[in-house]
């Protein structure tokens, strides 16, 4: 692979376009255009800021991109972002850091490993177990914020690579509602959704009730084995979700919101690998019927104490179930796996200096408690339990040193504890192991921001990220082993510009990451700590109007990574991190024929990247361009949309595993094939 950054034709065109598109006005809000950065409010760093004021590298998917049904899952919504790679059955990889980390597959059970990217919905962290499921369905979502780089100071656990923060819509005082029906050409794929909201007691009590049901099939072609016939629907995927909110506002200073949400997904979800001899026949390497259920009850309290102080409280309880039934050529080779989790989240934050011209900030207390029980029955037999908890005090203060200059300092001190029991019938014996981990960590953050004009802001920041150590089973050595925590020090400089009254928006971040103890999967498939590795790169995103009826939007990411030192994994020294394409780029163009009728065309390019840390050529993937096309008719009452995903029907790999004794045909993961769909939404 190339040793220097390279620009393909897509990026050259995009850069040239960004340089020449000056002037003109943004389309009106009712034309469903992208918002200006200074009007987008993000909340994923424990405080409300405009996107222009945020010093992290943040990309936002707002409701204008979510409402037409073209994006079916969180993974699809993130796939066009700079320096983000979405792999099958995985949380997103950011800046060359595997989002799953050591938590992929069996390691998630044997050692309770944690993912490196946290996903939060309305402030509540979502569990990740072995294989990504449960991210389908984006109905009634306000926006998705994607933070690249460590967010450990804000979120603590499993945020060393970044965080995805999703906000759902709040109850309204005005009565409103909507229903939607959507269809895709994936064999009877039907998406139905509805929402209703309004006041029960005027200005005092409001509600919101939303629901979505997706019934369809995936693009896999699973065979039914003659040696083990079944009547199970191997390719079905059914998803249902319901969310109810009740907002109580007895005064202008107090708001209490009760939320209950339930989610279930069953069928052909998770990782999709296909036999490599005929990969685009989509015959799966293995077959599993996944089952995910989640029930969450949460209370949010926002109380304004006086002009200087306010209090935010979040209390949430979650019941979470994850599992699968395997389907194999022989019934004796099948296993049924299940995991039950209950967890409690408490986060209390005091905001201060709300009316102070010199300083403002917050201090908070956070508590998380998780209990798990898991088992596998059948060809593979194991069981165990897990008790994990964390307690943290965190805070952040900003000092306005002058009208233009602001200094921000933050710190999180967190105590993490984990006790995990793992028992497995292994080669004639019973393996009994225990992981007993506890650690106190300090996660600082320092940033400085300078407003060089009303239009442009510059900033520089430094922060620290952390992910806990764990344990895992080495099948080859017949040994249960332990590995240490990993940390990263991240340094960034960047700028945000909103030019010509919001006509042009440009965001840029330059970053450097220094990793210590990076948790890596060795060539023996053993999680190993790499003493020293680094990465650096750039993210640029921009939006601009071209006249009154055209809008250009694009972005690109440049990335270089290197493993500098590893005594336990010497073959990897000097290599790239896996899932680290040197270039990711996107370019889109929107045109309004009328105030209501809009067409959008976008393309996303992902450079080639290695699939392992030994950088074997047989595992290189990437080097593909995915194109999307949509046409939307949007009025006060109707939203009618037709779209094509992967419009040019690109065939490419996101993962490759060569032929071996274990996999005589090899296997691959592929980009989703061309999909044509439409949706109709009626608002009232």
Can you say where each PLM-predicted feature lies in the sequence?
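N-terminal periplasmic accessory domains that precede
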Residues: 77, 92-93, 120, 134, ...
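Outer-membrane beta-barrel domain signature, strongest for Gram-negative TonB-dependent receptors
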Residues: 231, 235-370, 492, 505-507
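Membrane-embedded beta-barrel scaffold of Gram-negative outer-membrane proteins
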Residues: 300-304, 310-328, 451, 457-461, ...
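C-terminal beta-signal and adjacent terminal beta-strands/loops
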Residues: 605-612, 632-684
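Short acidic/polar hinge/loop motifs at secondary-structure boundaries
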Residues: 82, 107-111, 116-117, 122-148
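Transmembrane beta-barrel wall of Gram-negative outer-membrane proteins
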Residues: 176-178, 184-216, 220-221, 225-267, ...
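Structural signature of Gram-negative outer-membrane beta-barrels, strongest in the C-terminal barrel
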Residues: 246-252, 259-261, 366, 386-513, ...
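Gram-negative outer-membrane beta-barrel transporters
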Residues: 407, 415, 512-514, 529-614, ...
């Amino acid at each position: 692979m190339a040793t220097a950054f390279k620009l393909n034709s897509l990026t050259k065109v995009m850069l040239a376009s960004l340089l020449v598109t000056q002037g003109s006005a943004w389309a009106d809000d009712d034309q469903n255009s992208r918002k200006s950065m200074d009007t987008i409010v993000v909340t994923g760093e424990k405080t409300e800021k405009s996107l222009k004021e945020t010093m992290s590298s943040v990309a936002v998917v707002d409701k204008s991109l979510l409402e037409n049904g073209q994006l079916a899952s969180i993974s699809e919504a993130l796939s066009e972002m700079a320096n983000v790679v979405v792999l099958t059955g995985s949380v997103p990889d950011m800046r060359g850091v595997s989002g799953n980390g050591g938590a992929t597959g069996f390691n998630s059970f044997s050692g309770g490993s944690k993912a490196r990217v946290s996903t939060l919905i309305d402030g509540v962290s979502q569990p990740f177990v072995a294989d990504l499921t449960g991210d389908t369905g984006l109905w009634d979502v306000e926006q998705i914020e994607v933070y690249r780089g460590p967010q450990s100071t804000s979120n603590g656990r499993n945020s060393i690579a970044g965080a995805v923060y999703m906000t759902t819509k709040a109850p309204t005082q005005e009565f409103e509602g909507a229903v939607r029906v959507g269809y895709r050409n994936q064999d009877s794929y039907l998406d139905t959704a509805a929402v209703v909201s309004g006041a029960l007691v005027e200005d005092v009590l409001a509600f919101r009730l939303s629901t979505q049901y997706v019934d369809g099939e995936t693009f896999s072609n699973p065979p039914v084995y003659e040696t083990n016939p079944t009547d199970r629907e191997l390719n079905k995927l059914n998803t249902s979700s319901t969310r109810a909110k009740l907002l109580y506002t007895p005064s202008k200073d107090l708001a209490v919101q009760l939320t209950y949400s339930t989610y279930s997904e069953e069928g052909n979800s998770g990782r999709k690998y296909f036999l490599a001899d005929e990969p685009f026949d989509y015959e799966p390497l293995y077959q599993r019927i996944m089952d995910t259920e989640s029930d969450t009850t949460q209370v949010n309290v926002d109380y304004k104490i006086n002009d200087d102080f306010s209090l935010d409280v979040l209390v949430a309880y979650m019941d979470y179930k994850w599992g699968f039934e395997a389907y194999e050529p022989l019934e004796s080779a099948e296993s049924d796996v299940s995991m039950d989790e209950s967890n409690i989240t408490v986060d209390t934050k005091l905001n201060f200096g709300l009316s102070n011209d010199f300083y403002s900030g917050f201090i908070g207390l956070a508590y998380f408690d998780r209990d798990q029980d898991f088992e596998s029955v059948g060809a593979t037999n194991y069981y165990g339990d897990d008790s994990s908890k964390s307690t943290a005090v965190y805070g952040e203060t900003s000092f306005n040193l002058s009208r233009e200059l602001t200094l921000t300092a933050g710190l999180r001190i967190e105590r993490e504890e984990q006790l995990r029991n793992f028992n497995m019938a292994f080669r004639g014996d019973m393996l009994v192991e225990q992981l007993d981990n506890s650690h106190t960590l300090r996660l600082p953050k320092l940033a400085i921001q300078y407003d060089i004009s009303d239009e442009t802001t510059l900033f520089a920041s430094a922060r620290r990220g952390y992910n806990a150590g764990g344990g895992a089973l080495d099948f080859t050595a017949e040994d249960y082993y332990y590995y240490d925590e990993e940390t990263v020090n991240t340094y960034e400089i960047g700028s945000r510009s909103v030019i010509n009254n919001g006509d042009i928006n440009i965001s840029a971040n330059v970053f450097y990451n220094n990793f210590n103890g990076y948790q890596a999967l060795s060539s023996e498939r053993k999680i190993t700590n790499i003493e020293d590795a680094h990465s650096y790169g750039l993210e640029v995103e921009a939006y601009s109007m071209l006249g009154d009826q055209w809008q250009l939007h694009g972005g690109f990411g440049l990335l270089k990574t290197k493993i500098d030192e590893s005594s336990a994994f010497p073959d990897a020294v000097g290599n790239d991190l896996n899932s680290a394409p040197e270039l990711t780029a996107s370019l889109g163009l929107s045109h309004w024929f009328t105030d209501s009728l809009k067409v959008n065309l976008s393309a996303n390019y992902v450079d080639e990247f290695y699939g392992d840390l030994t950088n074997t050529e047989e595992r290189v993937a990437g080097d593909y361009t995915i194109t999307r096309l949509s046409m939307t008719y949007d009025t006060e009452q109707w939203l009618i949309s037709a779209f094509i995903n992967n419009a040019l029907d690109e065939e490419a790999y996101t993962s490759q595993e060569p032929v071996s004794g274990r996999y005589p045909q090899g296997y691959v993961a592929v980009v989703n094939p061309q999909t044509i769909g439409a949706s109709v939404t009626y608002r009232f």
